[in-house]
A protein has these predicted regions:
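Structured surface interface patches that mediate subunit assembly and partner/cofactor docking
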Residues: 4-28, 45-169
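Penicillin-binding protein/beta-lactamase superfamily catalytic region
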Residues: 32-44
Length: 169
């Protein structure tokens, strides 16, 4: 419904990466209410069971083409009280789908789905940009390019890594 909602006067227009500066959960520890409340909310949504979840998904898929056709170039995100370019908003949603598909696969012990490059490439670019904001260029560049120089984790959503890089030699 909100893809076609008007943008309220004075609503901030955020960039793809910049809008994460607005979200409280991005800066909060994983066990903080800002994060646990999201999990609690979606657990409550899923409490009706898998049949209800499949019904909601099927209904949403049926509405998707019309919603996308009616969407303008900018989308207001009411739960963040900001607007994003619709293409950026879609990258955010793709990232959520990819990350949570991996979460689900890991939790039930199966291989995660493989995403086509048109989906995965913008997701990985967003995650790399967010990791850079959290950890800095040196950590991310070394983590992605040189195992022997990596300081360890460079997660886009994890805590900032404080260990010292391993040196070749």
């Amino acid at each position: 419904d909100f893809l076609t909602a008007p943008i309220p006067p004075g609503a901030a227009i955020s960039s793809l990466v910049g809008h994460y500066e607005r979200v409280d959960w991005f800066h909060a520890p994983i066990d903080a209410p800002e994060n646990t409340s999201i999990c609690d909310h979606f657990n409550a949504l899923g409490a009706a069971g898998p049949d209800e979840s499949v019904e909601v998904l099927t209904r949403s898929i049926g509405q998707l083409a019309a919603a996308m056709a009616a969407a303008g170039p900018t989308t207001y995100v009411p739960w963040q009280d900001c607007a994003l370019a619709t293409d950026d908003f879609l990258v955010v949603r793709l990232m959520e789908l990819a990350v949570h598909a991996d979460d689900l696969a890991f939790s039930v012990g199966v291989k995660p789905p493989k995403f086509v490059p048109a989906v995965l490439d913008p997701v990985l670019a967003l995650l790399a940009a967010l990791a850079n904001r959290r950890h800095g260029q040196e950590v991310v560049l070394r983590s992605l390019s040189r195992h022997e120089r990596s300081s360890g984790q460079a997660s886009a959503f994890g805590p900032a890594e404080t260990s010292t890089p391993r040196h070749a030699g």
